[in-house]
């Protein structure tokens, strides 16, 4: 291994991390780095924003500029700490030996990817539905979505699970895969930190309306290209998955519905998935007891059924392999060009 170039070692570690996630998911015996990133974000949230007094709940009485600046400080600290610690781990590991470096990089790469976690959690929903337990299905889907699940019927639960797999295929699989392929664990973990900040403080609610601006906009920028690559992978791979999928319809629905979301990225993969499966996703949903109006994505060519969760997972798996193969081919091309 000592005679191998850093790029060759990176390719080996990247491949091993992908296989590890595919085989077992996140190593549960080791503390998950995303958990620690989340704790850092929560700590900085308390220190920088703190409790909002009742006399400042009125938007007109709050200092928007100051809150935005504090949010930007949080983003810079989290990114700096994440990148620095990851770089330190990689430097120390490769200093010990190439093998130690490859192992550390493979484990971190596995942590970045969520294909197995998405499949495992969404299939829990599927099994509860097949057993006729709507309450169990609601509880299972509540683990992976932010909406109120107690008001969902079986179709609503199924749609929520399919939407989650479709949307998280981008920010949970392809985006970290692309960033890890380009910049190794340092860039990959930095992306995961950005994504985690958005999921924790990137909301347009009373608390984070301005404090979360930097996190939300950075996440939009970081996911802009990966979300579109993810959608194209779903469209292309739907042609490989059998008669239950329609690539032409996936492309048509994607072109029509890809911007039917407040986020510039979220509907990219949802529209491709809806078209591939021939179902209608999105629509109004309840969050914290309030109905949020959302446009429908896709055409209702048939009723949504529990098997659509299985179909979505199959499409995600094939598309993940395709994304991985493209990354390896790109790295191989760079390696060949450097010789």
What are the residue ranges of the model-derived segments?
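Hydrophobic alpha-helical transmembrane segments
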Residues: 1-190, 194, 202-339
């Amino acid at each position: 291994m000592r005679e191998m170039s850093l790029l060759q070692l990176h390719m080996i570690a990247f491949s091993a991390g992908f296989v590890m996630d595919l085989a077992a998911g996140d190593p549960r015996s080791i503390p998950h780095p995303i958990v620690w990133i989340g704790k850092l974000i929560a700590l900085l949230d308390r220190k920088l924003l703190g409790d909002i007094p009742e006399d400042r709940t009125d938007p007109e009485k709050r200092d928007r500029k100051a809150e935005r600046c504090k949010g930007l400080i949080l983003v810079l600290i989290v990114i700096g700490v994440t990148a620095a610690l990851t770089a330190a781990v990689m430097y120390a590991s490769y200093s010990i030996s190439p093998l130690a470096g490859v192992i550390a990089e493979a484990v971190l790469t596995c942590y970045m990817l969520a294909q197995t976690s998405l499949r495992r959690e969404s299939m829990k929903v599927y099994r509860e539905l097949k057993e006729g337990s709507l309450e169990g299905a609601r509880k299972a889907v509540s683990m992976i979505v932010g909406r109120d699940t107690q008001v969902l019927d079986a179709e609503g639960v199924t749609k929520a699970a399919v939407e989650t797999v479709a949307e998280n295929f981008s920010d949970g699989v392809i985006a970290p895969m692309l960033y890890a392929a380009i910049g190794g664990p340092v860039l990959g973990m930095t992306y995961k930190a950005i994504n985690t900040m958005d999921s924790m403080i990137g909301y347009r609610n009373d608390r984070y309306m301005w404090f979360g601006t930097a996190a939300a906009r950075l996440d939009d920028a970081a996911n802009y290209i990966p979300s579109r690559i993810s959608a194209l992978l779903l469209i292309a791979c739907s042609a490989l998955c059998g008669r239950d999928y329609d690539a032409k319809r996936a492309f048509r629905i994607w072109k029509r519905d890809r911007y039917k979301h407040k986020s510039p990225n979220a509907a990219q993969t949802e529209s491709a998935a809806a078209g591939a499966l021939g179902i209608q996703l999105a629509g109004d949903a309840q969050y914290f007891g309030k109905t949020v109006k959302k446009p429908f994505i896709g055409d209702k060519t048939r009723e949504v059924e529990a098997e659509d969760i299985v179909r979505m997972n199959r499409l995600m798996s094939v598309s993940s392999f395709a994304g991985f193969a493209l990354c390896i081919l790109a790295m191989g091309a760079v390696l060949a060009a450097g010789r």
